[in-house]
Amino acid sequence: MERVSTLIIGSGFGGAVMACRLAEKGDKVVVLERGRRWLPEDYPSVSQRDWLWDEDEPEQQNGWLDFRYFGDMSVALGAGVGGGSLIYANVSVAPPPEVFERGWPEAIRFDTLREHFRVSGEMLNVQTLPDHQWTPRTRLMHEAADKLGQRHRFRVVPQAVSFDPDWHNGLDNAYSYGRSKTWTNAQGRTQGTCVHCGNCDLGCPVRAKNTLDLNYLARAEEQGAEIRPLHHVRWIRPLQGGGYEVGANDLDARAWRLIRADKVIVAAGSVGSTELLLRCRDQYKTLPRLSRALGRGWTSNGDFFTPAFYPDRQLAPSRGPTITSAIDYLDGSDGGARYFVEDGGLPDVLGNLLRHAGKHPKLARTRLAAALLEYRRDNTPFENMMPWFGQARDEPGGRFYLGRRWYAPWKRDRLRLSWDYRKAEKAVQGLADRHLALTEVTGGRANTPATWRWFKNLITPHPLGGCNMADTEKQGVVNHAGEVFNYPQLFVVDGATVPGSLGLNPSRTIAALAEYAAAQWR
């Protein structure tokens, strides 16, 4: 029976940081990742059928984008070595200090994490878009803030992207991959610089995007950590005398693997970690003393999207980094609603979907595509669209649990989400209304998507909570360092532990919390 000192489940912003730092401390680290290891030449195109992940048949379909549908809420998740960094929009920003003043363990405050925010920014090579590389969307954002008399709220956001100061869109073949300049990062990995090709969310072909496999995970492997792709963990059980046994489905070999570890770190993301622990407590009964707070306190982080159209303005949403700038209303000055407006971009894959009215049927059925196609009925050119995006600080109104399947009502083994939209309504509606105001002042045309206006449906790529950190077992699932109450040496370190909405992109916060957790390691 294989035994290691530290077993990490998942390789996103929590798992990657922990793998790196614990390997540096000399631990024998093994990382089990459900998805594949992706290279630029493997990245999906609109013609491919297998780039989506299917949780019901992962042996057959193990692409890197996992869409989950939970009634009124849909969640987009990453699947692959690097986790959510494979599909996120590069934004690497710290929340305002007041976020940590309520609902967090006493040990966690902004000052506690300040140095960890700095270190994670260095590891991710965080930069901002050079002034001469502003996209039409960036300029529209600046104009909108200015016309509302709120220029002070506008800012270019920090991104985990490498930019070439000599690049500009006036170059011949400016968007050609050949314009990318290669360089070697601190972990010895070859990367390129951004050529504004617009495919950040679905795979940077020049490796300008600083995904975790190029930094934290690369460093972990340098220090002896082993990453095993296509290993889907199904259960964890404690061992007599200490440690844990983990059962994983090896999707490549189509075989079961059992591994024992002194310490186990669950880092499968908000949905993945919560589901795994729910199954261990309620389905397999291997971790029966997990807190009753498990699954509760989940939030979509208030993500919202409004497509706007400018008939006389070329905005080229499929060019440039996916998100470049923000207009910050996190101070609550808009009637108490707190939100962070961003310019959105759409990768060429989704752009092609819309241009051709949805030739990829599974993606065409997603709520994002439905919202976009709703506004294509008058055949307004895709290049004239502004995807207003953003996050809002909603109240956690979600609870994950295991429910019944209609065809097997005697079993409770299907992950369900009970989500109360009323706890998100004030913040999300404030963001939605702001999108309309920004559109109007800049001469565009937009309506709040019917999916929200009529049905109160949302989609989020930034799920948070489910294994919330707290000071007591009654309040949460893990303590300030991510250790699970009642189960020594079992940890959760990822977005599942964040006990509330941040109101902006969460990757930097998750990385900083993981840096903090690793620093507590003994």
Residue ranges and their predicted role:
Residues G63, Y69, E106, S291-D413, ...:
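FAD cofactor-binding and catalytic pocket of flavoenzymes
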Residues M1-G14, V266:
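Beta1/beta-strand and adjacent pyrophosphate-binding region of the FAD-binding site
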Residues E24, K28, G35-S45, V206-K209, ...:
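Glycine-rich loop(s) and the adjacent beta-strand/alpha-helix scaffold that form part
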Residues G80, G84, G495-S507:
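Glycine-rich phosphate/pyrophosphate-binding beta-alpha loops
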Residues F110-L230, W454-I459:
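Conserved redox-cofactor binding core of oxidoreductases
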Residues D50-H132:
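Redox-cofactor-proximal catalytic regions of oxidoreductases
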Residues G12-F13, V271, R422, T497:
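Residue-level detector of alpha-helix initiation sites
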Residues N62, C197-C200, P238, R414-G500:
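A glycine-rich dinucleotide-binding beta-alpha-beta segment and adjacent secondary-structure elements
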